[in-house]
Amino acid sequence: MAAPDPYKPGKYNDPAGGVESSIGPQTQTQYWMKQALIDARKEAYFGQLASVFGMPKHYGKKIVRMHYIPLLDDRNINDQGIDASGATIANGNLYGSSRDVGTIVGKMPTLTEVGGRVNRVGFKRVLLEGKLEKYGFFREYTQESLDFDSDAELDMHVGREMLKGANEMTEDLLQIDLLNSAGVVRYPGAATQDSEVDATTEVTYDSLMRLNIDLDNNRAPKGTKMITGTRMIDTRTIPGCRPLYCGSELIPTLKAMKDNHGNPAFISIEKYAAGGNTFIGEIGAIDQFRIIINPQMMHWQGAGKAVDPAADGYHDFNDKYSIFPMLVISSEAFTTVGFQTDGKNVKFKIYNKKPGEATADRLDPYGEMGFMSIKWYYGFMVYRPEWIALIKTVARL
């Protein structure tokens, strides 16, 4: 049997003699699966943490929420303070956030036998705002693209890709808002701003440990329950952890990390996954954090210092170090704001007018053009910025 001609894919080879068929070349040279190959939908990494606040009609596009600062908090700054002796003090929050024994004892609101006008405190509240923005895009197509394209389900496939694209845009908007809303920002090493980031600004076990202490002091809740061991595999017990999001560029840095005793700090997910639930994209744990790799994680290209030739083993752009975020999001730190939604997901509004009478007008008198549009509302409101933390680090190649 003659082999197919690689230079003429449309040529039909006669099995017996290997001569071209008198019918002529074939127009369809490949077997097309009826169901086209479609890229897997990108996972909603940040969306899994968000609730959606449903914005009612006729109340504008802005939502406001009041947040009351606790009495014993340094942020509770007011002019109502009177101490136990009746003297006016700077702030009406007693000892605020202090944990010094001497300070706390000296500012306790003691009372004498006759009482009196003493120990007056005050309270403060702040307004949190979220605003709705409308987004959308559209595509156009012709009647002939529906009639003659080799994919009989072209319209369905393209429509599905439009919806996936809108979902990915929403996820990107949410990621940007979270990065900009972090109330705790840390730089490893000596850097204090982006322009000072160099090869020494690499995240370490100590950096993560101290970040966790900051979040604990901010009363940030831990979003996962304690994982218990199983008898199936050699499982390590992971305490209640916080999700930490980073890009795949940081995997070499994380897996090379050592703890304070010189042992590997990274615990791979298979060591503990059988004992409980895991996050989408989770690859392991370090100290109190669950490491979640988001392939769509953004970063700041070339925002650091100029690359040192003696320390060039890190990602850079235009000969400047790139900065990669490690984002920690505690439970109930934020919400997204939706309009006409079910309270759980962003709702997309889709219009698809096929070519014909519905689209025929003076600009398209023959009705040969159709269109599909998609629009949605997106809004974001942070409840507790001090519960969102960000480490800015370089990443090893």
UniProtKB/Swiss-Prot annotation:
Domain of life: Viruses
Cellular compartments annotated: Virion
Annotated segments matching region Disordered: 1-24
Cellular component terms (Gene Ontology): viral capsid
Chief place of localization: virion
Pfam families reported for this sequence: Phage_capsid_4 (PF25209)
Keywords for this protein: Capsid protein, Virion
Summary of the function given for this chain in its UniProt record: Assembles to form an icosahedral capsid.
The protein's name in its UniProt record: Major capsid protein
Annotated organism of origin: Pseudomonas phage KPP21
